[in-house]
Amino acid sequence: MTDSQTTATETRSPRRRRRLLGGTAASVGLITAMLTAGSLPAQAACEESGQWLFSPETESAESLVSAGPPQSNYNGTGSTASTTFSAQASATVEASVSGSANVSLDAKLASMSATYGTSFSPSLTAGPGNDITIDIPPGQTGNGEYGVYTVTVTGTETLYGPSCEAVESRTSTVTSPVRVGWNTWLS
């Protein structure tokens, strides 16, 4: 403290010092009472508190579940030829879960769709009557396979506490159908 501050403090009357200290104590008491009574806004409640949520982390490439055997046609001519393949059988593929199952399948599929921008379905069917025509160069074989494409997504299920802290985490894998279609290739 400087000399002027010391002098100013020493020249205050004992009565003024009691009043300043009393005012400070009253302010602290008022703030404490307000906090205890809940007069100040409380921290917002965590929406995820007590819930398990699924966070997708890795997505596989599409894989085809075939509806019947592959079809083939050899072009033994000297020019390009067209061939038409027709689906003869049907296949229904349903989504499956391995690992942790604290989050519903519907909630996992919704989270996956939002993350990857793909429509993940609980079930899709590839049926007969679907045709595709391809061009086959001379001396090559055209091949076609019809069915349901699936994608496998691995992610983490997390249980959240009252302050939105992760309380527990578990791995979960979902394989889901994403579309029906043909795979064609030349050999």
Label each residue range with its predicted role.
Residues 1, 20-21, 27, 36, ...:
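Intrinsically disordered, low-complexity segments enriched in small/polar residues
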Residues 121-174:
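Membrane pore-forming effector domains from diverse proteins
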Residues 27-37, 50-56, 60, 64, ...:
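Hydrophobic alpha-helical membrane segments, chiefly transmembrane helices and signal peptide h-regions
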Residues 79-138:
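Membrane-insertion modules used to breach or fuse lipid bilayers
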Residues 1-44:
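Secretory targeting and sorting signals
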Residues 33-43, 54-55, 151-159, 172-174:
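Secretory-pathway extracellular proteins and peptide precursors enriched for disulfide-bonded cysteines
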Residues 42-86, 175-187:
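Extracytoplasmic low-complexity, Pro/Thr/Ser/Ala/Gly-rich segments
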